[in-house]
């Protein structure tokens, strides 16, 4: 267990928006995956095991669903509840544009992803005035589509930790209409209204969504603490109840050095961490920040995958040298071992541990953290 920095900006493109997903962290509640798709989906997909929260870093396109179409672009969250048939397509990349790239948070415990209950009225379920976003910020599917077509259409269904292929003789999105409150939607992070304060505000004020045993937060461009003696960067701290995983999107994150778009920092439960040496002094007098990052805090330990270790910055724990707390060394860093490529630690799920063998998982979606 140690602090980590994954440099995923160099992750090569592969697969389609489903098969190209590479799980980098996971536990029995949620999995976090990266995807840089290289191919188009020629099939439809249904996740019957969990909700998906997709954050679009680069690229634009359309999610075709049984409820209609959702247009998406950079910095969009796309929420797809479990059981919804969909196909994700990206627009052609123009010269000078970044190739499509997105992050996926997928529930593994059967829970749903949605707004925090404290943002909603207990009487009406509407967003309250103090919430950092509201119903008008959510984009619903457009125009229920009717595909009165016959033929062979493949639908891949993720269930029981495997992906099963079914052939339909009619178009899977042949729906004439729908009602109710269970549907996919988009939310752009630029529509999130940050909560600011006189002194440093705690991370929960950045919360955007949550599932059982985890939360998703958005650190957006905002005004910084405005007390005359305020120190704008976070103070040194330990996460005693959670693992903290940040995906850096754009801007200048003042508390960290060596961070770039596509970086993932990981600070496990109990390990002290805080601003890098020199960043506190540089932050004094700052009025605003341009940072944009997506954070997932989990209330049970997250485990890195073998795939994640390919992007691990082994020198990251040493970046705090000179501060008052010791550099954390684990089995991969003791006695100079951090100078060599580290062999990934194999982790089994609770189910697998009981049976004494690795857990089988959906090969197509890259669920390999077990």
Would you name each region that the model predicts?
Residues 1-370:
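Jelly-roll (double-stranded beta-helix
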């Amino acid at each position: 267990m140690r602090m980590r920095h994954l440099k995923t900006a160099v992750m090569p493109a592969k697969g389609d928006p489903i098969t190209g997903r590479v799980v980098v962290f996971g536990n029995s509640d949620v999995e976090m995956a990266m995807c840089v798709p290289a191919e188009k989906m020629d099939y439809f997909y249904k996740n019957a095991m969990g909700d998906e929260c997709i954050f679009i870093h680069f690229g634009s396109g359309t999610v075709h669903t049984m409820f209609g179409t959702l247009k998406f672009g950079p910095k969009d969250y796309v929420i797809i509840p479990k059981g919804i048939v969909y196909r994700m397509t990206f627009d052609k990349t123009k010269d000078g544009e970044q190739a499509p790239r997105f992050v996926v948070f997928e529930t593994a415990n059967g829970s749903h992803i949605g707004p925090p209950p404290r943002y909603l009225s207990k009487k009406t379920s509407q967003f309250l005035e103090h919430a950092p976003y509201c119903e008008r910020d959510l984009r619903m599917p457009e125009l229920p589509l009717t595909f009165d077509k016959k033929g062979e259409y493949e639908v891949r269904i993720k269930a029981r930790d495997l992906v099963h292929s079914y052939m339909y003789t009619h178009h899977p999105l042949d729906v004439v209409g729908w009602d109710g409150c269970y549907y996919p939607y988009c939310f752009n992070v630029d529509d999130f209204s940050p909560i600011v304060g006189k002194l440093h505000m705690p991370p929960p004020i950045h919360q955007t969504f949550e599932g059982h045993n985890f939360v998703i937060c958005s650190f957006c461009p905002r005004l910084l603490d405005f007390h005359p003696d305020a120190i704008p960067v976070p103070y040194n701290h330990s996460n005693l109840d959670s693992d903290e995983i940040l995906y850096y999107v754009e801007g200048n994150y003042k508390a960290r050095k060596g961070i770039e778009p596509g970086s993932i920092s990981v600070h496990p439960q109990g390990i002290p961490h805080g601003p890098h040496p020199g960043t506190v002094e540089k932050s004094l007098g700052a009025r605003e920040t341009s940072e944009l990052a997506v954070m997932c805090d989990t209330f049970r330990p997250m485990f890195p995958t073998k795939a994640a270790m390919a992007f691990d910055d082994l020198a990251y724990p040493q970046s705090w040298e000179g501060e008052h707390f010791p550099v954390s060394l684990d089995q991969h860093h003791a006695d100079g071992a951090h100078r060599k490529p580290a062999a990934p630690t194999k982790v089994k799920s609770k189910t697998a541990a009981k049976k004494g063998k690795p857990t089988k998982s959906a090969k197509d979606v890259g669920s390999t953290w077990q």
